[in-house]
């Protein structure tokens, strides 16, 4: 275990308590390993192309821009909570990212993590649509199934 190094960690957020609990674990691990931490929010929408929060405004249609603005408004408190939870003297570099896509949320998260060469993914057991009877939500289950790296599932 002494050889384990999580230099890049990603936590998937949707605003649910399990996802925010997962963020707390991700913060602790990122601080322990002095990792880069990305808090990712994926918005599933019926659009033709993928858009992310770093895209220039002129490339987005008005309706897409409105959806992105709403996603930013919705996720800002989550991202602020994560920033506030981090130790002030932490060496962790925090990134926040919003991606809108018509594709499956779990697929976007897995693809993004792989493209960014993430070493650890952290997810909550269930998201906002989570049924209490399910131990593991469909997004978390798919991430565990298809991830290229270890996945920590937080209950």
What are the language-model segments listed below?
Residues 1-4, 84-121:
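Structural beta-alpha unit
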Residues 46-47, 104, 130:
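Generic structural signal for helix capping and beta-alpha/helix-loop junctions
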């Amino acid at each position: 275990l002494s050889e384990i190094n999580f230099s890049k960690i990603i936590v998937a957020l949707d605003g649910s308590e399990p996802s925010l609990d997962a963020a707390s674990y991700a913060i602790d691990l990122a601080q322990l390993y002095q990792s880069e931490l990305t808090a990712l929010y994926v918005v599933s929408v019926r659009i033709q192309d993928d858009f992310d929060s770093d895209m220039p405004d002129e490339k987005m249609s008005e309706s897409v821009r409105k959806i992105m603005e709403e996603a930013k408004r919705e996720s800002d408190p989550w991202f602020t909570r994560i920033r506030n939870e981090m130790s002030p003297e932490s060496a962790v570099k925090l990134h926040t990212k919003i991606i809108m896509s018509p594709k499956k949320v779990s697929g976007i998260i897995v693809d993004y993590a792989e493209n960014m060469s993430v070493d650890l993914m952290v997810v909550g057991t269930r998201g906002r649509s989570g049924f209490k009877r399910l131990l593991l939500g469909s997004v978390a289950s798919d991430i565990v199934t298809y991830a290229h790296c270890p996945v920590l599932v937080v209950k």
